[in-house]
């Protein structure tokens, strides 16, 4: 039995799981407040009376954003006052992404949520002295955002263990692209097609077809595949390794983009003026298999599928 889910990342404006602030972080909206109360991190009266303004068939994400973090602040304050025995180990195991994510979120809060590209130039360019000063200034906020991730992942791994014990495997979803307003782009600009001002030169989407005369303009920054190839695809290996710790099976979204990807000049209002560029092909997945071994992957091969895309799916060995 399988349970297929959407991406778990923290959602940004528009509330799409395919536009996340981080490819490694979990969404705080999924943290179960009743479980926090059972753990002694909340009192029921601290959240039971809150009107989340939702109905059984509709979530009010605006209300969640406005009201949930105040509750999580109380839980995290108690957690940080007496950290669990495994907390230091959690921080150590996630040190490759968590400190940058927590700093990014603290800085977003300090800048009223605006995109990182609108921050002061030293912060945009991650000048070491400026980052050190920010880490000191926002230390309490950084601690909060790290603690939130501990709560999310503790509950998630308990949920996955329960599902697996019932004979249920979880199919997770990995978006091919990350959001422009994400810690992934801010912390690793060299991995994306950005200009000297850290602005995308080309963005992602799909060409016009029978369903859409203008195509689809997703707007995500595109990868510098030459850089990823030169670095042995380490970022991708880390990203996929993280996914396989969360899920039993990983569905890779827009798999055809690894064969060829659609590139649209930044600033366009539609996808009409885009063109196809060559992706990394099977080389990426061979490097991933060398590093991680064989894993259960599903290749989402919808959309404009060519013989070349079919060959890549066949070479990879992944079911489509």
Spans of features found by a protein language model:
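Catalytic domains of carbohydrate-active enzymes, especially glycoside hydrolases
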Residues: 1-11, 242-247
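Residues at or immediately flanking beta-strands
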Residues: 2, 167-171, 296
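Alpha-amylase-like alpha-glycosidases and glucanotransferases acting on alpha-linked glucans and related
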Residues: 14-153, 178-320
């Amino acid at each position: 039995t399988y349970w297929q889910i959407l991406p778990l990342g923290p959602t940004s404006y528009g509330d799409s799981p395919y536009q996340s602030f981080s490819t490694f972080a979990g969404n705080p909206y999924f943290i179960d407040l009743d479980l926090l109360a059972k753990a002694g991190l909340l009192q029921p009266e601290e959240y039971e009376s809150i009107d989340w303004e939702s109905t059984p068939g509709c979530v009010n994400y605006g209300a969640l954003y406005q009201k949930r973090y105040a509750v999580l602040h109380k839980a995290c304050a108690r957690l940080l006052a007496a950290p669990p025995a495994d907390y230091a180990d959690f921080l150590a195991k996630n040190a490759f992404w968590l400190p940058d994510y927590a700093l990014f979120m603290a800085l977003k809060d300090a800048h009223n949520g605006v995109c990182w590209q609108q921050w002061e130039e030293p912060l945009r360019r991650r000048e070491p002295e400026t980052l050190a000063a920010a880490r000191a200034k926002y230390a309490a906020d950084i601690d909060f955002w790290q603690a939130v991730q501990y709560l999310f992942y503790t509950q998630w791994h308990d949920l996955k263990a329960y599902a697996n014990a019932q004979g249920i495997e979880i199919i997770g979803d990995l978006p091919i692209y990350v959001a422009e307003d994400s810690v992934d782009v801010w912390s690793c600009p060299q991995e994306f097609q950005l200009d000297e001002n850290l602005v995308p030169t080309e963005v992602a989407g799909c060409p016009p077809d029978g369903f859409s005369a203008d195509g689809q303009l997703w707007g995500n920054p595109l990868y510098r595949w030459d850089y990823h190839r030169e670095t042995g695809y380490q970022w991708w290996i880390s990203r996929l390794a993280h996914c396989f710790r969360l899920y039993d099976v990983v569905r890779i979204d827009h798999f055809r983009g690894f064969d060829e990807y659609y590139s649209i000049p930044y600033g366009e209002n539609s996808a009409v003026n885009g063109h196809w560029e060559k992706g990394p092909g099977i080389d990426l997945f061979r490097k991933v298999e060398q590093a991680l071994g064989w894993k259960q992957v599903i290749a989402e091969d919808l959309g404009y599928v060519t013989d070349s895309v079919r060959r890549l799916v066949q070479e990879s060995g992944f079911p489509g």
